[in-house]
Amino acid sequence: MKQTVYTASPESQQIHVWSLNHEGTLTLVQVVDVPGQVQPMVVSPDKRYLYVGVRPEFRVLAYRIAPDDGALTFAAESALPGSPTHISTDHHGRFVFVGSYNAGNVSVTRLQDGLPVELVDVVEGLDGCHSANITPDNRTLWVPALKQERICLFTLSDDGHLVAQEPAEVNTVEGAGPRHMVFHPNRQYAYCVNELNSSVDVWQLKNPHGEIECVQTLDMMPADFSDTRWAADIHITPDGRHLYACDRTASLITVFSVSEDGSVLSVEGFQPTEAQPRGFNIDNSGKYLIAAGQKSHHIAVYEITGTQGLLTEKGRYAVGQGPMWVVVNAY
């Protein structure tokens, strides 16, 4: 298995393309100059395209991924109705979802042969919209609205329109600020990192109709932490055994173990990392975690070790200015 790591640096308007080997070493393949401040990125389900959100001219860009080394070639673009904060796709590669924090909306762009061709739907009134997350069955889009302390739930229609479910939302605790999410591989649980109080909520998917319930909330900060809380990103290993979340003020990655059924998290430890970690990701083998330091202008590679999933640093690498996003592609 070959793996490529992509890092987005908006301040220098660059994407760095790296080859990741089996020992956790990165080798630079390409530096792409992007026409705008590049932030959120996602790889298409068929692993042939990288979709990128840019500002201040709000667009989604599509880059073809070379099958031999992961290098990028620009392919297409499509306008967006707001500044892109988060980008994702459905599991069949038919639609791109873009959440916009500043505009307070989530948009759906149709894909044709892997390329963005037209805006299909826009849902407004999502104050502080921070991500858009399709359920493993490809039926429901979960949209955390940070400023409204809620997660909005939409059914994805065959033509890409979003229809509010009943109930249309679930509330988080006051002052939480739901931000990013991941789903457990067993499809029965989801985990949401809350930006404002640096906690993680465990949500149970109760039935196929989209009903969900919060079954656990866990503080992700050390007991003696007294500064402003500012959580950012969350990811789970492919086997569902280990979960990680980061806080930017503390420049810390919190390590969680996940119970066998996915319902219970336990804090295993804390890993100091690059300054102001805005984004990170886990490779497809579940062996390495790559974190980006928005203030250090570096990325760091960690090996995931032992039954607790603790992190051991393998190396750090200079990237562009203000790196914010990391994605990994395997082929």
From Swiss-Prot:
InterPro entries: 6-phosphogluconolactonase_YbhE (IPR022528), Cycloisomerase_2 (IPR050282), Lactonase_7-beta_prop (IPR019405), N2O_reductase_N (IPR011045), WD40/YVTN_repeat-like_dom_sf (IPR015943). One of its GO terms (molecular function) is 6-phosphogluconolactonase activity. Pathway: Carbohydrate degradation; pentose phosphate pathway; D-ribulose 5-phosphate from D-glucose 6-phosphate (oxidative stage): step 2/3. Keywords: Carbohydrate metabolism, Glucose metabolism, Hydrolase. GO terms for cellular component: cytosol. It is an enzyme of class 3 (hydrolase). GO terms for biological process: glucose metabolic process; pentose-phosphate shunt, oxidative branch. It catalyses: 6-phospho-D-glucono-1,5-lactone + H2O = 6-phospho-D-gluconate + H(+). SUPFAM superfamilies: Nitrous oxide reductase, N-terminal domain (SSF50974). Its EC number is 3.1.1.31. The keyword ATP-binding does not apply. Pfam families: Lactonase. It comes from the Bacteria. Belongs to the cycloisomerase 2 family. Catalyzes the hydrolysis of 6-phosphogluconolactone to 6-phosphogluconate. This is 6-phosphogluconolactonase.
